[in-house]
């Protein structure tokens, strides 16, 4: 099956794949192309997806959103994430899924999306390139209602270690690919001082978010599995932090917007973290830090 671009294969799935099964598949040692490999030339697609209103309500409660008949932009990332994992766990994906770090995210909500609207979701990979700490790659997502694109997303992942042969990482290293390059980084200097709000995060937040999002990466689920993977305690999902920050701006954002974030230091659970935000010329900038504002966990902007 082929899509609009006749050169790109479309892998049509019967439904959203299991993230847990994809993670397990990605843990199996497989010979891969590595930084000098080739990305799969295909898109993964699910059509006619009916959204689960009860699951959305539970997701909204965990992330701090007001439950409405329209969905948060980050919810559409949650729905496309299983397609990302399916691609990254595939044998023809050049980087090993185990060890990939989600370092930045950009999403565009083109218009409000109703919870009752059926969706066509796609995901593909693009732009395998150097990062100052290894190799980075983009996973692209798209949500359509009929023929209308209502949401697009770009998640950037880092494989630490070897870079592509002959490649040089840009000075920025993280946000270099985005049209809004550098804007999220500028947030750190625009918002100074102590946080304007404190969030107390329970030790089981990772399990709560996993239950509503489907992201069952073991670093978020228990201290035992987190320690096996190099963390002293469980860590909060980066996309929970992203969603919680957008929820804190709820009621102040336009109907259509672009949100860009960088993920910095992981949040070890339980924790008390700080949130700060500013607005200038219609652009909201924000950051999530430790409680005194000295260490940054996430920085971002919305416009």
Regions found by a protein language model. Name each.
Residues 1-104, 164, 168-171, 175-181, ...:
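Hot-dog-fold acyl-thioester-processing enzymes
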Residues 103-146, 256-294:
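Hydrophobic beta-sheet segments that form the core/acyl-binding groove
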Residues 106-108, 156-158, 198-200, 262:
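Generic structural detector for well-ordered beta-strands
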Residues 138-165:
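Flexible glycine-rich active-site/ligand-binding loops centered on an Asp-His dyad
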Residues 148-150, 191-196, 293-299:
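Local beta-strand/beta-hairpin segments that build beta-sheet-rich folds
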Residues 160, 203, 266:
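Residues that form or immediately flank small-molecule/cofactor binding pockets and catalytic motifs
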Residues 264, 298-302:
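Glycine-centered structural positions embedded in regular secondary structure
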């Amino acid at each position: 099956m082929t899509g609009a671009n006749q050169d790109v294969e479309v892998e049509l799935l019967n439904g959203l794949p299991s993230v847990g099964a994809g993670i397990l598949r990605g843990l199996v040692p497989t010979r891969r192309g590595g930084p000098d490999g080739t990305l799969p030339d295909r898109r993964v697609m699910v059509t006619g997806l009916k959204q689960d209103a009860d699951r959305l309500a539970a997701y909204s409660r965990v992330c701090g959103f007001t439950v409405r008949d329209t969905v948060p932009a980050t919810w559409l990332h949650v729905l496309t994430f299983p397609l990302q994992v399916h691609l990254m766990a595939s044998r023809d994906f050049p980087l090993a899924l185990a060890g990939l770090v989600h370092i930045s995210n950009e999403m565009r909500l083109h218009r409000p999306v109703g919870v009752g609207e059926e969706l066509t979701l796609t995901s593909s990979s693009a732009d395998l390139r150097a990062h100052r700490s290894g190799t980075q790659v983009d996973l692209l997502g798209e949500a359509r209602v009929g023929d209308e694109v209502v949401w697009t997303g770009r998640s950037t992942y880092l494989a630490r270690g070897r870079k592509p042969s002959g490649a040089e990482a840009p000075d920025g290293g993280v946000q270099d690919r985005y049209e809004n390059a550098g804007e999220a980084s500028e947030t750190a200097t625009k918002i100074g001082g102590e946080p304007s709000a404190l969030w107390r995060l329970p030790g089981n937040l990772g399990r709560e978010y996993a239950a509503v999002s489907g992201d069952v990466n073991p670093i978020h689920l228990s201290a035992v599995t987190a320690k096996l993977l190099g963390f002293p305690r469980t860590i909060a999902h980066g996309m929970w932090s992203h969603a919680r920050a957008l929820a804190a701006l709820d009621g102040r954002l336009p109907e259509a917007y672009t949100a860009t974030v960088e993920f910095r230091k992981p949040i070890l659970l339980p924790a008390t973290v700080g949130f700060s935000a500013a607005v200038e010329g219609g652009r909201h900038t924000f950051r999530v830090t430790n409680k005194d504002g000295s260490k940054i966990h996430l920085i971002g902007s919305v416009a």
